[in-house]
Amino acid sequence: MAATARPARPRAGQLVIIGGAEDKLRHRTILNRFITLAGGPEARILIVSTASSLGEEATDLYAQLFRQLGAAEVVSMRPLIREEANSPRAAELIKDATAVFLTGGNQLRLASVVGGTRLGRAVVDGHRRGLVVAGTSAGASAMASHMVAFGAGGATPKQRMTQMSAGLGLLPGVVIDQHFEQRNRIGRLLALVALSPGLLGIGIDEDTAAVVGHSGVLEVIGKGSVTILDPAKLQTDAYEAKRYRPIMVSGVILHSLPSGYRFDLRRRQLRANLRPVDATDRELAAVNAATERTRRLIRRIAAEGADDTAPERARRRASRSQPLEEASE
């Protein structure tokens, strides 16, 4: 009896992890890549804007952009409570989509509302079968299994300068931070990998994206750089540092990768670089179509989540009015 061939396992879809404030008016390199990966003229995009405080404004802007860039269909949803994310309609929308786009805003809101629901599971299962998933700013942080919940900026890693929680689980083994250079987040990413040395730290600048394929190779596109922190040979005193004191971090390998460079996340190795992508005349001409209202909205979207140190400040004010003691979190 002849042996029957096993059906080929579906390949996971690509992830487009954007550091926020991606170019929406001129080159639009990152958004163009997303549409291409999603199917170009056959792309069917689902926008999930749960993270954003701007609601329909942010959704409508991205819908307009994706249609301008050639997507065949764009639909959206904004579940604000877990019951909405658990609705059958949420999972059905994923089945009809070729790609999902997670907007920026507050990643803790996104993960708290969507994580572990029908919608969250449908995104993860769809990605395993080839669904392309992109996230910008807060949407980028939420894509990993481990997520930066909130924290303070600064170059020096300190105890308790940030907190980590569960993300959506699309990319295991990493923790992702965004607006990386612009909001000076190197210190908190160092603190995170010092506390969790099994994870790679990935920091993505604004208007920059890490495109991760099914093979686990990350490609950098856009204007800035992607910083990768590998703590495999880490030495630290993080387990001894008290409260908000600086912690010692040594032996972390730092990779700073501009556009065109690639990194193998599984082997933790740099790969041969690619040629950076140039803008087309069509992309450059698009800037003339932008209205001043659109420009203002783009600035507001880029600023979402900028003040994520509020929980930290509140905790410090409370600690000044109480006797010193070891706090638990």
Question: Model-found features: residue ranges?
Answer:
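Catalytic nucleophile loop
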Residues: F101-G104, V123-M147
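Portal/gating segments that form or line small-molecule/metal binding sites
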Residues: L46, S52-D96, L102, R109
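C-terminal and late-domain segments of enzyme folds
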Residues: M1-P41, I47, S53-Q68, M147-A149, ...
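Catalytic-core regions built around general acid/base machinery
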Residues: E92-D96, G116-G130
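Glycine/threonine-rich flexible loop motifs
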Residues: Q107-T117
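Structural recognition of the beta-strand scaffold that forms the well-ordered cores
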Residues: V16-I17, L46-V48, V75-S76, A99-L102, ...
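Short gly/pro/ser/thr-enriched loop/turn and capping motifs at secondary-structure boundaries
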Residues: L108-R109, A140-M143, T227-I228
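Short, structured patches in soluble enzyme cores that scaffold and shape functional sites
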Residues: R78, G104, D125-H127, P172-F180
